[in-house]
Amino acid sequence: MKINLGGRISFVFLKFTMNKVYLFLFLIHFSSFANNCNNSVKEIYQNIITSIGNNSLYPPELHFSDETRSVAYMSSKGITIEQKTIDLFCGKGNFEDKIAYIIAHELAHYYLEHSWMSNTGLSYASSIGEFVEDSSSLYSVKQKKLSESQADLYAGFYGQIAGYNTLGFGEEALTEVYESYSLPKELNGYPSFDERIDILNSRRNKANDLALLFELGNVFLKNKNYNSAKYCFEFILKNKFNSREIYNNLGLSYLL
């Protein structure tokens, strides 16, 4: 029996070459897919910044990181979100809503100037990722819970008027983050995971109500029902939410 080794070697070589080609094409596709998600994150970030419209603080810059320990955090450079976090949600359902929650929550701490998040110098530890176990009396657990409540309400409202259901998918996003990063559910001096979920859910209805009031105010303004529009925008401002659009629309309600 005569075996054609040359033909067999050629076949194996061809198969090996094709596998390399498939792998190369897969990597190109994956890289393109990841870039699309990163571009979406940039767009989401800008949309939320625009919805906040706060000129009292210079908008922080967005940065991506290849580290895999902090999820998202504030620093003197701005807001950083890890690529691992983006990849966690990339290509899955409600990607924009989940990423919007992460981003809006960090932006909330930035604009609300929650200095308890300060770690060392001008660096910060994220309320979602790299935790600070601070037992100092200056910022008690009660104060941290209040700050988290404020941040979720803030993130819910501004995320909603930017077009994202941030608090509707906040619990799902947090759960996936905790599991992916193997974060402990209990931390000394900080709200537990269950408390974070309770805080998030407790603020959902109020954030949605305020966002609905904002949309109603716009409808009233468009239909020349100026007194009702004034009530909507003033009620939102009395709840300590402001943006250029809210003030502009309130001003139009008085002028028209």
Labelled PLM ranges:
Residues V21-F30:
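Sec-dependent N-terminal signal peptides
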Residues A34-L256:
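A Zn2+-metalloprotease active-site environment signal
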